[in-house]
Amino acid sequence: MKGIGNRESGIVDGQRNGASVGSVTTALPIPDSPLPIPGARKRAPRIALIAGEASGDILGAGLIEQLRLRYPNAEFVGIGGDAMRGVGCQTWFDASELAVMGLTEVLRHLPRLLKLRSAFRERVLAWKPDVFIGIDAPDFNLPVERWLKQRGIKTVHYVSPSVWAWREKRAEKIGVSADLVLCLFPMEPPIYAKHGVDARFVGHPMADDIAYQSDRAAARATLGLSASSTVLAVLPGSRHGEISRLGDTFFQAAWLVSEHLPNLHVLVPAANPGCKQLLAEQLSRSSLPVMRSHLLDGQARTAMLAADVVLLASGTATLEAMLVKRPMVVGYKVAPLTYRIVKLLGLLKVNRYALPNILANDDLAPELMQDDCTPERLCVALLDWFKHPDKVAALQPRYLALHAELRRDASARAADAVAGLLSQRESGMENRESAGAGA
């Protein structure tokens, strides 16, 4: 991973593969994933997909759009949401039926989920797809992929589980289920290669969506803040458990920062109404001035763009903060028993937790985990960013290089890889037909 930000960064005289910096464009064809020739197939391909979350629905829609450019008459069916339906996917079940979180909720819905999975795989097998694509949701998708692969259907898993962080041996088991794994991060394919699994780095769609140069002034105008304001964005998580563990600590840290920066504005985006209610309760018992605390409905990216510094939980949000080029402080806590078990068994294989730090193999953002995640230590780390603009400036080229590394037109690359798998399947069928005719 060392030096990842410098490898093929694609920023030369303000351009990337012919695209101007800050724009999102279609990448050039990938040499090792040749596009199929339209009309060369005997029939249009049938492609089945499952996306079990909103993020997967968006990924699925982008992939379908790119596959349709290659196969205009292709048929798409599966489990998805509004985004996939909007690009012509016939959804047999809605993605919301898979949207369960937490062990208790999963157990409560397990009989229904097992029944749905059984019904889907039987129906898709009868439909005879050329390929099945499971998008994220590994607990649901990998068993479906394995079952279909055993019956001769080509399978793809889009979005690798975090095999680089823990339980690396899962890579081999994933290979039993998927003919091809599409990875969002460059450190993932080498791990799969060690286990004999075909995995391709396609880039991260979020890196495609976010411009290289962010507009802080526009974000502040959207939120009614002046360009000269001092702003901290606070994101304790998007789940009830995370917010319960981190919210009070984060808001106490923000108050300590405000003691040094009296005109500080604090932006708190809430992922959903349930999170908003919990965050409102935590804010009400904090010492933060009401007039300078802004609880938002969603708008996490806008809050990050408007901020000078971001305080957030470890997770995908750290990647988003990196892509909008904001200095951050990362905190996280898990249940004490969970933490002891993980440490005792050595389940985690990484020394860093925040995605920017993992991608850079360097400490770009302070990480304060478990017992170190205290208001006082968070405050010290935050003030270090606020009071040293030279450090913030030095961070920008590092973030920009990582952004370029991930910005590969992910949907197009993923479609190229799927097209290659379809071509392999068709070649195999033609070879069998030729052998049969010769006999």
UniProtKB/Swiss-Prot annotation:
Question: Which Pfam families does this chain map to?
Answer: LpxB
Q: Which reaction does it catalyse?
A: a lipid X + a UDP-2-N,3-O-bis[(3R)-3-hydroxyacyl]-alpha-D-glucosamine = a lipid A disaccharide + UDP + H(+)
Origin, by domain of life? Bacteria
**GO BP of this protein:** lipid A biosynthetic process
Enzyme class, spelled out: transferase
Q: Does the keyword Lipid metabolism apply?
A: yes
EC annotation? Answer: 2.4.1.182
**Which Gene Ontology cellular-component terms appear in the entry?**
membrane
Q: Which UniProt keywords apply?
A: Glycosyltransferase, Lipid A biosynthesis, Lipid biosynthesis, Lipid metabolism, Transferase
Any GO MF annotation of the entry: lipid-A-disaccharide synthase activity
Under the heading CDD domains, the entry gives: Glycosyltransferase_GTB-type
Under which pathway is this protein filed? Bacterial outer membrane biogenesis; LPS lipid A biosynthesis
Under PANTHER family, the record lists: LIPID-A-DISACCHARIDE SYNTHASE, LIPID-A-DISACCHARIDE SYNTHASE, MITOCHONDRIAL-RELATED
What HAMAP family does this protein map onto? LpxB
Query: What does the function comment of this entry state?
Result: Condensation of UDP-2,3-diacylglucosamine and 2,3-diacylglucosamine-1-phosphate to form lipid A disaccharide, a precursor of lipid A, a phosphorylated glycolipid that anchors the lipopolysaccharide to the outer membrane of the cell.
Family named by the database record: Belongs to the LpxB family.
Supply the name of the protein: Lipid-A-disaccharide synthase
Protein's organism = Xanthomonas axonopodis pv. citri (strain 306)
